[in-house]
A protein has these predicted regions:
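Contiguous, well-ordered alpha-helical segments that form the cores/surfaces of helical PPI scaffolds
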Residues: 134-142, 156
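An N-terminal alpha-helical hairpin/helix-loop-helix interaction module that forms a charged
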Residues: 1-128, 144-264
Length: 264
């Protein structure tokens, strides 16, 4: 089973992946701790608060090519835009009672407003705009036990490997609910793996302060590491294409329906 093979690699390479002088994947939990410690939407000095909250994100968001946090900081350099940024985050972080469609709508609104404003100060920039995965990460920072970090390549590769029976799409067709459902399935599988739970609880004790994400960052870490550290390329793990995966899922559903009908 592909999932067990991935879990085996995650366990056997855990020390290497979390080596502070090496890959240091534990920084994801430190970034969350830092955000939780400093975030205050009503802070008098919003700019300093925002910088303090986001300072440990490392390459989770900004890298040499794209800098969405840099885009927000560009706006925060303009004294007359600070309240605009604050209100965008306030709207994004509204309670939604678990309504993922409403949440996805707020993601789009945040992107549209922010990007239109960023364009006023950095016209045509490809470096600063907010993308879907960035905004999902902002949500994960604020409500880590209610969201999952998302990166398209890693997520699609994972779905193909485990033959996830649904298509969360991409771009305009993306479905937050379907992506989160896939993550929920991984969450329930990994929480039954005693070895990973043991390794993770030691890491969590070391790296995390002031929050309980209910293993949601761990779920993303497994999806991310499987892609980044080539868990799929040892020849044992067979991956399918998204198209083939969805087709197989539909056939499975039809067989199940027939079996139910025949059993009646």
């Amino acid at each position: 089973h592909n999932l067990n093979l991935i879990f085996e690699q995650y366990i056997s390479r855990f020390a290497e992946l979390n080596d502070l002088d090496g890959n240091d994947e534990g920084y994801k939990w430190r970034a969350e701790s830092c955000f939780v410690e400093h975030w205050d939407i009503d802070a008098e000095d919003f700019v300093s608060m925002f910088k303090a909250s986001t300072k440990e994100m490392s390459n989770l968001i900004d890298n040499a090519t794209v800098q969405p946090i840099g885009g927000i900081l560009l706006l925060l350099k303009q004294p007359n835009e600070v309240e605009f940024v604050r209100e965008c985050f306030r709207e994004l972080y509204e309670e939604d009672g678990g309504d993922l469609e409403a949440r996805q709508d707020r993601i789009y609104v945040f992107m549209e407003k922010m990007n239109a404003k960023i364009d006023q100060y950095a016209s045509g920039s490809w470096k600063y705009p907010q993308k879907m995965n960035n905004v999902i990460y902002y949500l994960s920072l604020r409500y880590p036990n209610d969201n999952y970090i998302f990166k398209a390549t890693e997520a699609t590769e994972w779905a193909n490997c485990i033959e996830y029976g649904d298509d969360f799409g991409s771009g305009e067709t993306f479905s937050l609910a379907k992506y989160y459902r896939m993550c929920d399935e991984l969450l329930s599988a990994v929480s039954e793996n005693d070895e990973i739970m043991e390794l993770h609880s030691r890491r969590f004790e070391k790296e995390a302060r002031g929050f309980d994400d209910e293993l949601h960052i761990l779920v993303y870490d497994i999806i991310y590491c499987a892609h980044t550290y080539h868990f799929y390329t040892d020849g044992i793990i067979q991956t399918t294409s998204a198209k083939e995966r969805i087709k197989r899922a539909q056939i499975r559903d039809e067989i199940e329906k027939l079996e139910i009908e025949l059993a009646v």
